[in-house]
Amino acid sequence: GIPCGESCVFIPCISSVVGCSCKSKVCYLD
């Protein structure tokens, strides 16, 4: 639920390495 400051419209979340995931075109951490 916390924005990771990254979008995932065209590419996956680079921040997924720290647990962020793509939700509604934005990367979120829980």
UniProtKB/Swiss-Prot annotation:
Superkingdom as given in the UniProt entry: Eukaryota
GO biological process, one term: defense response
Record-linked Pfam families: Cyclotide (PF03784)
Post-translational modification: Contains 3 disulfide bonds.
Swiss-Prot/TrEMBL domain comment: The presence of a 'disulfide through disulfide knot' structurally defines this protein as a knottin.
Function as written in the Swiss-Prot or TrEMBL entry: Probably participates in a plant defense mechanism.
Family: Belongs to the cyclotide family. Bracelet subfamily.
Protein name according to UniProt: Cyclotide cter-F
